[in-house]
Amino acid sequence: LPAALGVKNGDVKMIKNAGGIISHPFGSVIRSLLVAIFELGVTDVMVVAHSDCGACHMSAEQMIEHMKARGIHQETIDMIRYCGVDFEKWLYGFGDTEKSVRETVDAITNHPLIPHDIQVHGFIIDSHTGELSRI
């Protein structure tokens, strides 16, 4: 990504996560954005997803099966569900990368703690060519 953007380390503040998805409006991604905006002076936000993303079509059910295969017990999963975690919402993927980027841009743009003067842009980077396409 830095090569596609023509930036070096330190030129930008990067927040990375699986799928480029904001899974909670007051989670760590938004917290990191708030720090970047209010403490580090960031004025522009770029949401960049990549083609062939591993989070595309991700299934909570399938991931839970992978967890169990790696030794996570059903009782642990049940206890976490009992504590209020909805695995289907928490571990969801997406089917349409462009739609997902638009939803993430919208979530940032309309967040009550993000100032209206912050510019938020969406992009998809081609995993094979590095080409960046604006959404």
Predicted regions and their residues:
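Divalent-metal-activated hydrolytic enzyme cores
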Residues: G20-F26, I37-L40, A55-I135
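Well-ordered alpha-helical segments embedded in enzymatic catalytic cores
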Residues: R31-V35
